[in-house]
UniProtKB/Swiss-Prot annotation:
GO terms for biological process: cell redox homeostasis. Component of the thioredoxin-thioredoxin reductase system. Participates in various redox reactions through the reversible oxidation of its active center dithiol to a disulfide and catalyzes dithiol-disulfide exchange reactions. This is Thioredoxin. The gene is trxA. Keywords: Disulfide bond, Electron transport, Redox-active center, Transport. It comes from Streptomyces clavuligerus. InterPro entries: Thioredoxin, Thioredoxin-like_sf, Thioredoxin_CS, Thioredoxin_domain. Pfam families: Thioredoxin (PF00085). Disulfide bonds join C33-C36. The keyword Lipoprotein does not apply. CDD domains: TRX_family.
Amino acid sequence: MAGVLKNVTDDTFEADVLKSEKPVLVDFWAEWCGPCRQIAPSLEAITEHGGQIEIVKLNIDQNPATAAKYGVMSIPTLNVYQGGEVVKTIVGAKPKAALLRPGPVPR
């Protein structure tokens, strides 16, 4: 059974993501985005084996301020935040293996 991803909003982003003690992967997505739906099962599967990183979702249509603040121009965009800063960005639908790979991912 896949894990459930927590939804964050413009109002909860700072507390849930920027002030988190562990790294947080934020999935910037939208309902109408086919590739976003394509990667959702991979992200949910990763949460089952997690513990080292938290994975959350932010709907850009409902929460445009945070997406704009971090320059999200296309979706899906996955940003990893650590200590309040973006430490890794993945743009586009990537296979699960690429999502698990440490270090920067080519765009």
